[in-house]
Swiss-Prot record:
EC top class, as a word: ligase
Organism: Bartonella quintana (strain Toulouse)
One of the GO biological process terms: aspartyl-tRNA aminoacylation
Location(s) in or outside the cell: Cytoplasm
UniProt-recorded name of the protein: Aspartate--tRNA(Asp/Asn) ligase
GO CC annotation, single: cytoplasm
Superkingdom, taxonomy of origin: Bacteria
Entry function: Aspartyl-tRNA synthetase with relaxed tRNA specificity since it is able to aspartylate not only its cognate tRNA(Asp) but also tRNA(Asn). Reaction proceeds in two steps: L-aspartate is first activated by ATP to form Asp-AMP and then transferred to the acceptor end of tRNA(Asp/Asn).
Gene3D superfamilies: Bira Bifunctional Protein, Domain 2, GAD-like domain, Nucleic acid-binding proteins
UniProt KW keywords: Aminoacyl-tRNA synthetase, ATP-binding, Cytoplasm, Ligase, Nucleotide-binding, Protein biosynthesis
Positions annotated to bind L-aspartate: E175, R221, H454, R495
Catalyzed reactions: tRNA(Asx) + L-aspartate + ATP = L-aspartyl-tRNA(Asx) + AMP + diphosphate
Molecular function as annotated in GO: aspartate-tRNA ligase activity; aspartate-tRNA(Asn) ligase activity; ATP binding; nucleic acid binding
Membership in a protein family: Belongs to the class-II aminoacyl-tRNA synthetase family. Type 1 subfamily.
Length: 597
């Protein structure tokens, strides 16, 4: 018999009754029922119940074991009586009457419980992550993560993609966040950078004559953490294809993404044909470029009802600013003064002056609007608003006025808040859509210059002619995002493969030819030697797994994550290094940095 086990702790069934077996694992819990000891023995695969009575030669040792000790047991498989069968466990019809026990490893007093999975402070969980990962939910999360990544790889390979591994030590380049820098010992005073994304490498693979690339790529960005973004390191499904247009990417990647969601959605419906929504439409209807389409609320421009109205606040805003609009945010079933007042208080807590609103009631077969706005704009305009918005008795609507560029984000937050408060959001589905036609540039008011709105390597719609003839702020890019349930889960684009257009695009953003050649020299050179049209995308693996597992925090689906302060509490990183190491690198740490100031 094997030194440690003949079976794992999930393998034995009723047909194994009578067998002499050997199991090894962790003591999940111990129970004493009338002098008979019951031990739940746990390993990676599951749990088997071990039984020891006072007559067993192993009883004296079993009495001593405690939670999370590691033991080996030898014994006989016996059938449980019908009244004590555990239908929750696959092994619930049997138990092992123990004959021999060996203690393989003892455990100190636990800093957090493994059995029962109560809430526990996150910093303790991260410091003792090896214990946290023994808990059933966390263990399942990590195994599901592996299953999803395996399914992604299989699907990509089945669709003709080849997996390549790109370097982790590269040159620093601006990708929208700070780089993690790695000092060079051989070339003192110079630094490598960990890649924020394999953007240039994957494009260079297309220059190298490869056709369809993918990689589950580690990416490193020194940015502030959020619940839906891990500090430091994250993983993305990186994809690039040669000789493609935007539609080719959609036709190829949409079935792959849909199949992954369907395989791991636990029966929840998944969008079959992903709608294409322009960036401008997404902002106007949903107040976000990553709309949650499970929320049925669609915002509308209702400015025409407020021009020259007696609701002077909105009328003056429209008169004083030609770009001003009034947006309506319908709230089906929200037609009570209490709810409207609650929303108003919430808006004020968000730093806003408040929310205008109307709610409707039906009196003697006639709809009546209530609230300050209805009182000021009159019955005719109030009814016209109700008809346009498709509202009924018991419904409400909230209003925001001003320049949409300034209030659209808040309007989107109002839409989300209403959907959550009124339970309008369908929590039992995955709603996916492509967001397309992103603006190429945006205006940086602080620096009085153009910035890239998205990826600087994308192809401008209209090509070279548009670059030369159009107002840069009206340019659209062949740039797209894939969104799901209010999260951006992928981003991509058709790439610019012309060196002349590359220079023109970066010149518009204030970067000279010399800067482009310095920061993106490899890509710029490659464009001079026969560059194929190409495009692709990158999908956030961690975020997709988070959605499929139904958790709110990425740390729940990552093995050894940092905390919110970008500290690795398990490995005590970042850490001090020795003076000798610093001397080898030609680095001296400033006194202020040593003191943490």
């Amino acid at each position: 018999m094997h030194r440690y086990r003949s079976h794992n702790c999930a393998a034995l069934r009723k047909h194994d009754v009578g067998k002499h077996v050997r199991l090894s694992g962790w003591v999940h819990r111990v129970r004493d029922h009338g002098g008979i000891l019951f031990v739940d023995l746990r390993d990676h695969f599951g749990i088997t119940q071990i039984v020891a009575n006072p007559a067993s030669p192993a009883f004296e040792i079993i009495e001593k074991v405690r939670s999370e000790w590691v033991i080996r047991v030898d014994g006989e498989v016996c059938a449980r009586s019908d009244e004590v069968i555990n239908t929750v466990l696959p092994t619930g019809e049997i138990e092992i009457f123990v004959k021999e026990v060996e203690i393989l490893s003892k455990s100190d007093e636990l800093p957090l419980p493994v059995f029962g999975e109560p809430d526990y402070p996150e910093d303790i969980r991260l410091k003792y992550r090896f214990l946290d990962l023994r808990r059933e939910t966390m263990h399942k999360n990590i195994m599901r993560r592996t299953e999803i990544i395996t399914a992604i790889r299989r699907s990509m390979q089945n669709n003709g993609f080849t997996e390549f591994t790109t370097p982790l030590l590269t040159a620093s380049s601006p990708e929208g966040a700070r780089d993690f820098l790695v000092p060079s010992r051989i070339h003192q005073g110079k630094f490598y950078a960990l890649p924020q994304a394999p953007q240039q490498y994957k494009q260079l693979l297309m220059m190298s004559g490869f056709d369809r690339y993918f990689q589950i790529a580690p990416c490193f960005r020194d940015e502030d953490p959020r619940a839906d973004r891990l500090p430091g390191e994250f993983y993305q499904l990186d994809v690039e294809m040669s000789f493609v247009e935007q539609e080719d990417v959609f036709v190829t990647m949409e079935p792959i993404m849909r199949s992954i969601f369907e395989e791991f959605a636990n029966g929840k419906p998944v969008t079959q044909n992903f709608p294409r929504i322009s960036y401008d439409e997404a902002i106007k209807k949903y107040g976000s470029d990553k709309p949650d389409l499970r929320n049925p609320i669609i915002m509308q421009d209702v400015s025409q009802h407020f021009y020259d109205s007696c609701f002077k606040i909105f009328a003056q805003i429209l008169t004083n600013d030609e770009n001003a609009q009034v947006w309506a945010i319908p709230a089906k079933t929200g037609g009570s003064r209490a709810f409207c007042d609650r929303m108003n208080l919430w808006a004020q807590s968000e730093g806003q002056p408040g929310l205008g609103y109307i709610f409707w009631r039906e009196e003697e077969g006639k709809f009546e609007g209530a609230g300050p706005i209805a009182k000021n704009i009159g019955e005719q305009r109030t009814e016209a608003l109700r008809i346009q918005l498709g509202l009924e008795s018991g419904d409400a609507c909230f209003f925001i006025a001003g320049n949409p560029k300034k209030f659209s984000t808040f309007a989107g937050a109002v839409r989300t808040r209403i959907g959550e408060e009124l339970d309008l959001i369908d929590r039992e589905c995955f709603s996916l859509a492509w967001i397309v036609d992103f603006p190429f540039f945006e205006w940086n008011e602080d620096e009085k210059k153009l910035d890239f709105a998205h990826n600087p390597f994308s192809m401008p719609q209209g090509g070279k002619n548009a670059l030369e003839c159009q107002d840069p702020l009206t340019l659209k890019a062949f740039q797209y995002d894939l969104v799901c349930n209010g999260y951006e889960i992928a981003s991509g684009g058709i790439r610019n493969h012309s060196p002349e257009m590359m220079l023109k695009v970066f010149n518009l953003a204030g970067l000279s030819r010399e800067v482009v050649e310095d920061r993106f020299g490899a890509l710029y050179r490659a464009f001079h030697y026969g560059a194929p049209p190409h495009g692709g995308m990158a999908a956030g693996v961690d975020r997709i797994i988070m959605l499929l597992q139904g958790v709110k925090n990425l740390r729940e689906i990552a093995l050894f994550p940092m905390n919110q302060q970008a500290l690795d509490l398990l490995m005590s990183a970042p850490s001090d290094v020795s003076s000798a190491q610093l001397r080898d690198l030609g680095i001296r740490v400033a006194p202020a940095a040593k003191n943490g100031s």
